[in-house]
C-alpha cells in the first residue's frame, strides 16, 4: 500500500480499504454527511440508538459524535459508543455544536470530554468557549475568527491530549505542540447547511484510515474538503448548485491533485 505520509496518500488508502464510520450526527446533517463519506470513498453508518450504539462501535473503524440535535436518549447512545470505541482503541471525533448555548448542551459536552475524544472539531466560537473563553457565537454560527481561537485550541489540545481542529476561512489544527493552517475552500461552504457537520464525519474516516497519525489524518481531511470546495465553486451559481457540485468534486478528487493543490503551512 502507498505510504500514508501525504493527504493524497491517505485519500488513496481510504479508497483502497473503505472504513466503516459510525456517525452519530444530527437530523439536519445525516443525509449530506452520509453522501460526503460515500463520495470520498468511505462507508457511513448513522447508528445512534443507545440500545445498539456500543455494539456497533465494535464493528466500526471510527466514531464521530455531533451534538447538533440533542436528546437524553441520544446522549446515552453517544456515551455508550464513545466508551466502546475508546475501549477498543479506535479513534473518535467530537463536534461540540453550539455547546455554549444551553446548560443541557454544556453538561452533555462535559460528559463527552471526560470520555477522551481523540479529535475535537469545531468552529472558532465553539473552541474558544470549550477552552473557557468568552466567545461571540450565536446559535450554531461562529462570530469569532479562526486566528482568535488558535491559543484556545492549543490549550484544549494539551488539556485533553487530543487533536483540535478549528475550521473556518482558514483552518487550524494542533496537537498542543505542532500546529498547521490549511487554506482553501469557498465562501459558499457556510451557506450549505450541515456541510461542517459532514466534515467531522470525513475527519473520522481519515482517522480510521491512519490511526497511527491522527494529526496528519485530520489535516488531510480538512485539505480534502478545502480543495473539493474550491472545485465545486468554479461552476456554482449559488449554494444550491454548489452543494451537488461539492459531492461531485469530492468524488472526482484524486491523490495527485490533492497533494499538488493543498495549501498547508506551519503555524
Swiss-Prot record:
Superkingdom, taxonomy of origin: Bacteria
Amino-acid positions noted as binding substrate in the UniProt annotation, renumbered to this chain: 46, 194
Enzyme Commission number, as recorded: 2.7.1.50
Record's keyword annotation contains Zinc-finger: no
Positions that bind ATP: 121, 167
One protein family per Pfam: HK
Parts forming coiled coils: none
InterPro entries hit by this protein: Hyethyz_kinase, Ribokinase-like
Signal among keywords: no
EC primary class: transferase
Cofactor requirement: Mg(2+)
Keyword annotations from UniProtKB, A to Z: ATP-binding, Kinase, Magnesium, Metal-binding, Nucleotide-binding, Plasmid, Thiamine biosynthesis, Transferase
Gene Ontology molecular functions: ATP binding; hydroxyethylthiazole kinase activity; magnesium ion binding
Reactions the enzyme catalyzes: 5-(2-hydroxyethyl)-4-methylthiazole + ATP = 4-methyl-5-(2-phosphooxyethyl)-thiazole + ADP + H(+)
Involved pathway(s): Cofactor biosynthesis; thiamine diphosphate biosynthesis; 4-methyl-5-(2-phosphoethyl)-thiazole from 5-(2-hydroxyethyl)-4-methylthiazole: step 1/1
GO biological process: thiamine biosynthetic process; thiamine diphosphate biosynthetic process
Family: Belongs to the Thz kinase family.
Role, per record: Catalyzes the phosphorylation of the hydroxyl group of 4-methyl-5-beta-hydroxyethylthiazole (THZ).
Name by which UniProt lists this protein: Hydroxyethylthiazole kinase
